Amino acid sequence: MDQSDKNPNRRLRVIPKWSELCPDLLRSIFEQLSFTNLNRAKLVCRSWNSASRGCVPKRNQIPWMILFPQKSENNSSNNCVLFVPDDNDKVYKTRDLGVDFAQSICLATYGSWLLMFNHLRNLYILNPLTLERIDLPHSTSINPNMCYPNFKYYRSACLWINNITKDYLVVWPIYNKCFFTKKGDDTWRFAPACHIRMKDQIIYNHKDHKVYQYASYGFIYVWDFSSDIPHVDKHLPAVSFISGREIGDKNKYYRISHQMVMSLSGEVVVVKIMHYYDLSRWRFRIFELNPLTQRWVKVDSLGDAAIILDMGITVVAKDIPGIKKNSIYFSGLNHPLTDPECRFVYDLTTGTMEPLPQCVLSSMLFSDSRWFLPGFTS
């Protein structure tokens, strides 16, 4: 018998460590992975992360939730928690992102990107998955003496970014003025024609370069951002059935609010949100504009689609594990930010709320959260 067969370490020498696998072999495996699984693989070790560069995963179609930390002795302010719905029993903690999230506010999301505003009045775009960061012109270029509102309650802004070229557009209303900046700008530009208030919701449709504004009393204005000087394009009929007032009905008190969403066909729909304070219950109604009558009519079902309210988008949800069709993904928006009952998936078929798993809510003391859709493009 060969004496080498008696050596107990012989097998250890011929079997390589998983962290030392050939990069070409790793890449051939990574290219077969879904977006979610590829991002998991990147976190295994440095060599896997390096080998994954350049790999294009299958397009992600599942909304994720990111939870931002509270300022606490037990919390790290530089890490966030990620929840992926097809991993119902676990959460993921991001690497140190070099950002003090406890003193920052997420104003908007687009794909994997977050539009952040910190206590130093800096705005920047951050990708928590790739660690990429794009610093925007400092807000003092708008007005160095401006007194800023509490953005925990006034988060009217919209973000669009191209994942490859990193071209971007950020539209940011401050009080009764509207400012915007694009890739290559070294300052914020004033849009004098756009009368957008910080309480007004705005969404951006890159396909037609239009910003849609939901203003007071249900008016919807459309602004054209295809040129360097934005201008009003048109306005849609008033959504008269929605208001933002408090309503009392005997012992039941609830608040009506609204959000605009882009449909799969590129049309604006309006989501009516009703919050019953005494019952901790929420209800949602969806309305679309009838092009013939120019009236808003109720939509009974989304069919095989779902709404991600934080992003103002509708996505396909047919036969996709991890996303629920005919549902609305909701994270509370401007409601009490740390209330776990404000984060759920609303089933339009049954009119019920599906809460987040306990592992998500107990993962950290959070100050805010957002649904986002890694890999999304429009």
From Swiss-Prot:
Q: What Pfam families does the record tag this protein with?
A: Beta-prop_KIB1-4, F-box
Looking up CDD domains in the UniProt record yields:
F-box_SF
Per UniProt, residues of the F-box domain are 16-63
Query: What protein does this entry describe?
Result: Putative F-box protein At4g17565
Q: Which organism is it from?
A: Arabidopsis thaliana (Mouse-ear cress)
